UniProtKB/Swiss-Prot annotation:
GO MF annotation list: structural constituent of ribosome
Species annotation: Rickettsia bellii (strain OSU 85-389)
Record keywords, A-Z: Ribonucleoprotein, Ribosomal protein
Superkingdom of the source species: Bacteria
Family designation: Belongs to the universal ribosomal protein uL30 family.
Annotated disulfide bonds: none
CDD domains: Ribosomal_L30 (cd01658)
Protein's UniProt name: Large ribosomal subunit protein uL30
Amino acid sequence: MNNKNLINDVKVTQVKSSIGRKYDQKLTLIGLGLNKINKSVVLKNTDSVQGMLKKVEHLLKIENV
């Protein structure tokens, strides 16, 4: 397998508020290290992170780094 084609990091920015969202979505944002609008974090692109991003993708802007 060629590791050069794999994306290692993902930059995630919270663009919508967690107010009025389900409790598990709020916990997912906290788990990703996001707690304020326009806060960005760079995360390793793992299966668990991908699952968390999919759960709250409507609140985020996701970019490959």
